[in-house]
Structure formats: C-alpha cells, structure tokens
Amino acid sequence: MKLSQCTSMNQIIEYYISNQITDTGRSSTNKQSVFYVKDIDKTHTANCIDTAIASMCTLLDKGIESGIIVFTMNISSTKSQTHYIPYSKENGSYILFNYINPTLYHTITTKRLNDGVDEQLTWLVENYERDFNCHVKQTKVYIPSKDICNCLYQFHKENKRISQIDIMTMCQR
C-alpha cells in the first residue's frame, strides 16, 4: 500500500511502521523505532497504561528519544486490541503522549473493564507529570515524518477528525 492510499489513521500508522521498521524491531534508516510491550491480560487494564509509561521512561533513560510503543490488550480469548503510542523527548524533559486510535482509548475509559480504570488513569497522568518532570498531552500526535504529516493533513481536510492546529504543529517540526 502507498501512503496516498491510506484512508484511516490506523492505516497511516501501519504504513509508518511497516516502512520504518526492520525484522529486528529497530529502524535501519533512522532512529524512529517500534518497541513491542508484552500482551496484557484483560483483568489488568490499568496496568497497560502503567506499562506504557514505564516503557517510555526506560527507553528515554537509554537515550532512545523517540519512537512508537505498541502493545496489545486481550479482551477475551478470541479478541484483542492493539494500541500505538508515539513518544518523543521534547525540550529536554517533555513527552508527547497520545493514543492514535481514540476509539480504543474511549473503550478503556468508559466500559470500565477493570474497576477504577478512570481514577487510575487520572492518577497515572498526575503522578507521571510530577514524578518524571514530563507533561502528558492527549491532544497531539507525534509522528516526525514530513510525508506522514502531509498525509495526516489531507486526512484532516477530508474527515475533520484531528485538529488542524495539531497537524500544523507536527509539520513544522
């Protein structure tokens, strides 16, 4: 599939991953990488957020300043959800944090697959900002590729599902 043929955010991300990442899980062309996090059982919904945050901080500590974390959450024995979390070190200490597919994020926070998920998410965001000197943003997508940015801009013009300001911010990086 060509980038111009992508018709959804998920397809754009899949294109980005498939064209940037080698079989070893690290990009051979630049430092953008995908890191796979273990499958997480449906009874530990809040822990998947915790795991993603911990993974980002661990990777930053190792000097890997940007990438996409991918993890799957098992909903049942036959169904799972995959989440893509792009992250980047910004201004020395900031991470841009976003669930690319807002529908999946909405599922976690509203269906309450685990008691207290909403409160746990709030706690993690608050403590993450304070303890790690990072600012969690759920309104921006960080994908540092000009082609991807242009494609997202086209997608916005056709679907109006992502903020134009956010896209302009991305494309100016």
Regions found by a protein language model. Name each.
Residues M1-R173:
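A structural boundary/capping signal
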